[in-house]
Amino acid sequence: MAKNPPENCEGCHILNAEALKSKKIRKSLKICGLVFGILALTLIVLFWGSKHFWPEVSKKTYGMEHTFYSNGEKKKISMEIDPITRTEIFRSGNGTDETLEVHDFKNGYTGIYFVGLQKCFIKTQIKVIPEFSEPEEEIDENEEITTTFFEQSVIWVPAEKPIENRDFLKNSKILEICDNVTMYWINPTLIAVSELQDFEEDGEDLHFPTSEKKGIDQNEQWVVPQVKVEKTRRTRQASEEDLPVNDYTENGIEFDPMLDERGYCCIYCRRGNRYCRRVCEPLLGYYPYPYCYQGGRVICRVIMPCNWWVARMLGRV
């Protein structure tokens, strides 16, 4: 009979421990439920806010069709703009004369597909509108300067070998259109003054402006006054072969042809060339913008010879 009280006390301790444990479990469940409720409420508020205040990306594809007459024949040009993939597609012609021009603003490429030739030509393009910069200071005539060439004096010539590695067009709309045809890079080739003189000697009837004022009026929409070219700078292109050049390929240096194709430097040039093109300045709307403000803006860049860059790294220039 004397051993019963300790047994009862031991049972009381066990009951108290179980009760305390159940209280801790209930308290933990309450805390977890409160945290879960706060998280759920936060997610609901974020979802509601993003739905009502976050600008939704339009999934609509914009299209436009233009009809015109050429040599008495009715022709159509259609344009399709996809703001999600940032592509712009132009279609013209029918059957074997059909041509597709794809502007991929996301990856910075332009693809031109000719159905009759079953060939695709690729060139690079800008991805964004360049920032406006102040006009350059006047350059001394006696200084070694570059020659300015405008887009009208550039011919796009395809490369001799087709493109083998197409991984750079993996996520581009161009690859979907040109996947089963041969693809070539096209490179800008400058028209020298000597070539224009050859046309005159052959008896071609070329209608050049008879006065300086008339020439400026005709080209006013293409050339801005800040980048007009002097005649003395044009004529220096004819004697370009007489200029000295440091050819580092004799020392075992080989230039990647992609440097020339992408426009980083010119492998076979003896002097730098200033290449100008007209860039469409947007009037708001979805990207890519199909509208140009006052015909666009002239953007120029200087492409130096690849040998010049090597000489600069060696400290020779």
Curated annotation (Swiss-Prot):
<feature type="topological domain" description="Cytoplasmic">
    <location>
        <begin position="1"/>
        <end position="30"/>
    </location>
</feature>
<comment type="similarity">
    <text>Belongs to the chondromodulin-1 family.</text>
</comment>
<dbReference type="GO" id="GO:0016525">
    <property type="term" value="P:negative regulation of angiogenesis"/>
</dbReference>
<feature type="glycosylation site" description="N-linked (GlcNAc...) asparagine">
    <location>
        <position position="180"/>
    </location>
</feature>
<keyword id="KW-1133">Transmembrane helix</keyword>
<dbReference type="Pfam" id="PF04089">
    <property type="entry name" value="BRICHOS"/>
</dbReference>
<feature type="glycosylation site" description="N-linked (GlcNAc...) asparagine">
    <location>
        <position position="94"/>
    </location>
</feature>
<keyword id="KW-0472">Membrane</keyword>
<feature type="modified residue" description="Phosphoserine">
    <location>
        <position position="239"/>
    </location>
</feature>
<dbReference type="GO" id="GO:0009986">
    <property type="term" value="C:cell surface"/>
</dbReference>
<feature type="transmembrane region" description="Helical; Signal-anchor for type II membrane protein">
    <location>
        <begin position="31"/>
        <end position="50"/>
    </location>
</feature>
<keyword id="KW-0325">Glycoprotein</keyword>
<keyword id="KW-0735">Signal-anchor</keyword>
<dbReference type="GO" id="GO:0016020">
    <property type="term" value="C:membrane"/>
</dbReference>
<dbReference type="GO" id="GO:0005635">
    <property type="term" value="C:nuclear envelope"/>
</dbReference>
<feature type="disulfide bond">
    <location>
        <begin position="120"/>
        <end position="178"/>
    </location>
</feature>
<dbReference type="GO" id="GO:0001937">
    <property type="term" value="P:negative regulation of endothelial cell proliferation"/>
</dbReference>
<comment type="function">
    <text>May be an angiogenesis inhibitor.</text>
</comment>
<protein>
    <recommendedName>
        <fullName>Tenomodulin</fullName>
    </recommendedName>
</protein>
<feature type="topological domain" description="Extracellular">
    <location>
        <begin position="51"/>
        <end position="317"/>
    </location>
</feature>
<feature type="domain" description="BRICHOS">
    <location>
        <begin position="93"/>
        <end position="186"/>
    </location>
</feature>
<keyword id="KW-0597">Phosphoprotein</keyword>
<keyword id="KW-1015">Disulfide bond</keyword>
<dbReference type="GO" id="GO:0071773">
    <property type="term" value="P:cellular response to BMP stimulus"/>
</dbReference>
<dbReference type="InterPro" id="IPR007084">
    <property type="entry name" value="BRICHOS_dom"/>
</dbReference>
<keyword id="KW-0812">Transmembrane</keyword>
<dbReference type="GO" id="GO:0035990">
    <property type="term" value="P:tendon cell differentiation"/>
</dbReference>
<keyword id="KW-0539">Nucleus</keyword>
<dbReference type="GO" id="GO:0001886">
    <property type="term" value="P:endothelial cell morphogenesis"/>
</dbReference>
<dbReference type="InterPro" id="IPR043405">
    <property type="entry name" value="Chondromodulin/Tenomodulin"/>
</dbReference>
